[in-house]
């Protein structure tokens, strides 16, 4: 009898592990309604707008080895597709890519990318646009889509890197109060831009938190930190990220419009840290996480794609987390898209993008964002790229 009970227990454990550790396969369009995707932000989401906005003819992202994994440079800062492309594919947008808004003649019926490299929340970026300018451009184009279609479509935002990189360069000795004041200024402007989008009919928001900026290869190289991250930038990113969830909670709770306010927060900061942390990166099959695949310098972080720079190129980009000094390889981008779309509640809350799409428009959210250090895991982690190591 004891042996039988032990056998049942073992089988039960195996069943649980099988359920929660089998890879989640996202089938494009499966059970997902027809919605559009609109993206706003900087080079991480730029689908090629910088190419059409800039007067320069030698932009590095238009030259090999950018686009290497897709056989051609496509104006994106990666060896292939970026996160919005994978999300577009998951929701069956034609060709599985999101077109840049500045490219003439593109089909914008299922959405478009307003993101531009070098974009910021504050200031006046050269040959780029602030987030507010991107939102105003959407406002001017709004008549291309029905109001009811806009209400159920996705609005993805990733921006802020330029603001904090520029602040750190200009204020290397800024004290805590100066840092806090700057973060507050950035967040207030971001809040106004999201409020403007909301007033234009957007109701489903996906906000991606900032990466650990101090761990970018270009930052390690410029600040000569070796294998360590530059903590001042990481601290600024953490301060910024900590204000996003409460801000979106407030929007959702005070919404009075008939279409409501619903959102998803992607904790990109911790998703990245998992993959670049010493001793854990191999669990995700990333063998090089502190230097770039393409570039020159101590961390191969500068000059990728520039004709006047004899940059190095790694032999196998899928073993690298970073493709250039600031941007991820297609492999890393795809992992992030899967996490965001339907996987890991540790880094995506209060719901995944897939859940957000099908959530009834106008319905009050049943769950809200919670700080990670206080949140109780509602479901086992589904970061299947980590496998058994996800249980820690």
UniProtKB/Swiss-Prot annotation:
Active-site residues annotated for this sequence: 43 (nucleophile), 324, 327
Give the enzyme's main class according to its UniProt record, as a single word. Answer: hydrolase
Record's keyword annotation contains Glycoprotein? yes
Q: Which UniProt keywords apply?
A: Glycoprotein, Hydrolase, Lipid degradation, Lipid metabolism, Secreted, Signal
Give the EC number(s) under which this enzyme is classified: 3.1.1.-
Q: Write down the glycosylated positions.
A: 146, 166, 290
| Annotated signal peptide | 1-28
Task: Give the Gene Ontology MF terms in alphabetical order.
Answer: hydrolase activity, acting on ester bonds
> Which GO terms are recorded in the biological process aspect for this UniProt protein?
glucosinolate catabolic process; lipid catabolic process; response to insect
Question: What is the predominant subcellular site recorded for this chain?
Answer: secreted
Pfam families xrefs: Lipase_GDSL
GO cellular-component terms in the record?
apoplast; chloroplast; chloroplast envelope; cytosol; cytosolic ribosome; nucleus; peroxisome; plant-type vacuole
Q: At the top level of its lineage, which domain of life is listed?
A: Eukaryota
Q: What does this protein do?
A: Represses or inhibits nitriles production from methionine-derived and from indol-3-ylmethyl glucosinolates. Favors isothiocyanate production.
Tell me the protein family, please. Answer: Belongs to the 'GDSL' lipolytic enzyme family.
Q: What's this protein's name?
A: GDSL esterase/lipase ESM1
Species whose genome carries this gene: Arabidopsis thaliana
């Amino acid at each position: 009898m004891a042996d039988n009970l032990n056998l049942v227990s073992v089988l039960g454990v195996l069943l649980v592990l099988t359920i929660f550790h089998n890879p989640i396969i996202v089938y494009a369009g499966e059970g997902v309604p027809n919605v559009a995707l609109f993206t706003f932000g900087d080079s991480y989401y730029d689908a090629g707008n910088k190419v059409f906005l800039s007067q320069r003819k030698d932009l590095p992202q238009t030259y090999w080895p950018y686009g290497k994994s897709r056989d051609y440079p496509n104006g994106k800062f990666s060896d292939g597709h970026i996160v919005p492309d994978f999300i577009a594919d998951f929701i069956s947008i034609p060709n599985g890519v999101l077109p840049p808004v500045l490219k003439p003649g593109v089909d914008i019926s299922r959405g478009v990318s307003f993101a531009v490299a070098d974009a910021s929340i504050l200031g006046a970026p050269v040959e780029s646009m602030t987030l507010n300018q991107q939102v105003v451009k959407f406002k001017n184009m709004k008549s291309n889509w029905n109001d009811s279609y806009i209400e159920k479509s996705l609005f993805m935002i990733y921006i802020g890197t330029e603001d904090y990189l520029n602040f750190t360069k200009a204020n290397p000795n800024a004290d805590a109060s100066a840092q806090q004041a700057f973060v507050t200024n950035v967040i207030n402007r971001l809040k106004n831009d999201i409020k403007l989008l909301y007033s234009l009919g957007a109701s489903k928001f996906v906000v991606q938190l900032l990466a650990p900026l101090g761990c970018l290869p270009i930052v390690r190289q410029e600040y000569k930190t070796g294998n360590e991250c530059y903590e001042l930038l990481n601290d600024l990113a953490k301060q910024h990220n900590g204000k996003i969830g409460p801000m979106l909670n407030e929007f959702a709770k005070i919404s009075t419009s008939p279409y409501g306010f619903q959102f998803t927060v992607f904790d990109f900061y911790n998703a990245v840290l998992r993959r670049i942390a010493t001793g854990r990166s191999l669990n995700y099959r990333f063998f090089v996480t502190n230097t770039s695949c393409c570039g020159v310098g101590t961390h191969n972080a500068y000059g990728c794609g520039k004709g006047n720079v004899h940059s190095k190129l790694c032999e196998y980009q899928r073993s690298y987390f970073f493709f250039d000094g600031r941007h991820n390889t297609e492999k890393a981008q795809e992992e992030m898209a899967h996490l965001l779309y339907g996987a890991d509640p540790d880094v995506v809350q209060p719901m995944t993008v897939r859940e957000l799409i099908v959530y009834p428009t106008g319905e009050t959210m049943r769950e809200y964002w919670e700080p990670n250090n206080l949140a109780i895991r509602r479901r086992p982690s589904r970061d299947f790229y980590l496998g058994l190591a996800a249980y820690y």
